[in-house]
């Protein structure tokens, strides 16, 4: 077991960075890191699961801050001053979580190190929800990064497993004009009671295509005159927004919550892949359809929202055993298709909602109040499905090696083989 220690660097010692991608910061407890054995992919994942189970009662913990973006994941000390780890997204292989032990873990390799030197980094939280959001953010980052790298594989229409609730974002489309996204009015439960929770309104989706009276602007104005709004209007700073809200007696202290996690990842994607972002056609399947609220993160990960079904199934065939995709059947609101990666390939199952509004798997008597409960029940239960559902996901954008002098090495999804190393993590001491 290795822990962050004296080898860590202060964030201020890294020098000024010309580009700072938007990120999402979350708190957690860092337990430690351990090397991954040199075994077959599935066997290595199984041994990692056993090791995580053995470490569930480990008392060696350290408060840290995890910062997610489409460029990667950074781990800072609890005060946010010391950078303990930095992993580019392309070097993170696998992510998983265990609700019973409140554990979140991911497998990654170090920069410029071979694919044989992989390490698993373990974090815990005080309750399952805390580690679940860490897992969701990392897995959705995997998917969004893949979508930006492969825009030709996008879906023509986005699947939706369930209503997203009160935080809907409505596209406004007109011929020749990119769709704008308008947020619904804020409700009481969307007002933060914490002044530190304020996030700038400039992180909201582009509102530049709408005038002050709510009408659409001409195409020339929408594309040119409002560009500065999309890129961040200085007059929409957090301080000014908060002061204006207090003066108008909308709130006493505090401010509006920021956009959703997915919205911030979307903006990060625009910055990380500007060429792909601009080349992506506006409309169904485009970047605007990737905007979603926190409550829909789980469903969009299950369905690999934004990717065509054939491409999603192709990626599923190369994932770990138990990985699955869950999407609604076209033309119906009461049936879903559950595809599970097994030892024999991808096995389809049918999920339906009965007359009582409860969810069931075809040919199985058990009923569940929600899709989440159904998935949780069939995770780790050998007798219910041919292969139990897995909480782990492989990163489809993982690269076994870094860029060389002659260009980028080909990507692959069999990175857990050839992993045998007792070397210490760089910068972890």
From Swiss-Prot:
Q: Name one GO cellular component term.
A: postsynaptic density
Q: Which SUPFAM superfamilies match?
A: PH domain-like, SH2 domain
The UniProt entry, under SMART domains, shows: PTB
Keyword entries, A-Z:
SH2 domain, Synapse
Localization, per the record, is: Postsynaptic density
- Residue intervals of the SH2 domain: 302-398
Q: Does the keyword Metal-binding apply?
A: no
Q: In which tissues is it expressed?
A: Highly expressed in brain, particularly in Purkinjie cells in the cerebellum and the cornu ammonis of the hippocampus.
Identify the CDD domains for this entry: PTB_tensin-related, SH2
Note the superkingdom of the native organism: Eukaryota
Q: Which Gene3D superfamilies match?
A: Pleckstrin-homology domain (PH domain)/Phosphotyrosine-binding domain (PTB), SH2 domain
Q: Does the keyword ATP-binding apply?
A: no
Reported function = May be involved in synaptic plasticity regulation through the control of Rac-GTP levels.
Its subunit composition reads: Interacts with BCR.
Q: What is this protein called?
A: SH2 domain-containing protein 5
Native source organism of the sequence: Mus musculus (Mouse)
């Amino acid at each position: 077991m290795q822990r962050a220690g004296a080898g860590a660097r202060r964030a201020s010692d890294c020098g000024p960075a010309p580009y700072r991608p938007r990120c999402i910061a979350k708190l957690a407890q860092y337990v430690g890191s351990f090397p991954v054995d040199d075994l077959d992919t599935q066997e290595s994942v199984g041994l990692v699961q056993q090791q995580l189970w053995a470490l569930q009662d480990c008392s060696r913990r350290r408060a840290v801050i995890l910062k997610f973006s489409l460029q990667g994941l950074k781990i800072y000390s609890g005060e946010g001053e010391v950078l303990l780890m930095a992993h580019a997204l392309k070097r993170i292989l696998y992510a998983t979580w265990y609700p019973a032990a409140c554990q979140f873990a991911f497998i990654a390799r170090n920069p410029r190190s071979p694919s044989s030197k992989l390490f698993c980094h373990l974090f815990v939280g005080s309750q399952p929800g805390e580690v679940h959001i860490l897992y969701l953010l990392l897995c959705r980052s995997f998917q969004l990064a893949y979508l930006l790298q492969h825009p030709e594989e996008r879906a023509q229409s986005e699947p939706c497993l369930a209503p997203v609730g009160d935080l809907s974002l409505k596209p406004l489309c007109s011929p020749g004009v990119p769709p704008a996204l308008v947020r619904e009015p804020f409700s009481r439960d969307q007002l933060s009671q914490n002044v530190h929770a304020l996030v700038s309104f400039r992180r909201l989706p582009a509102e530049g295509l709408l005038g002050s009276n709510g009408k659409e602007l001409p195409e020339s104005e929408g594309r040119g005159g409002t560009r500065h709004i999309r890129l961040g209007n200085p007059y929409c700073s957090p301080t000014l927004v908060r002061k204006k809200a207090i003066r108008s007696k909308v709130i006493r202290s505090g401010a509006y919550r920021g956009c959703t996690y997915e919205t911030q990842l979307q903006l990060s994607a625009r910055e990380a892949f500007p060429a792909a972002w601009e080349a992506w056609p506006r409309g169904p399947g485009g970047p605007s359809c990737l905007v979603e609220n926190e409550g829909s993160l789980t469903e969009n990960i299950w369905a690999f929202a934004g990717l065509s079904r054939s491409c999603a199934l192709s990626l599923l065939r190369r994932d770990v055993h138990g990985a699955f995709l869950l999407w609604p059947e076209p033309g119906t609101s009461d049936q879903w298709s559950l595809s599970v990666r097994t030892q024999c390939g991808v096995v389809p199952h049918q999920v339906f909602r009965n007359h009582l509004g409860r969810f069931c798997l075809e040919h199985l008597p058990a009923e569940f109040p929600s899709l989440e409960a159904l998935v949780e029940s069939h995770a780790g239960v050998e007798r219910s499905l041919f292969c139990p559902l897995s909480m782990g996901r492989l990163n489809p954008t993982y690269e076994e090696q870094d860029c060389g002098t002659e260009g980028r090495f080909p990507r692959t999804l069999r990175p857990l083989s050839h992993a045998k190393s007792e070397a210490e993590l760089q910068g972890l001491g």
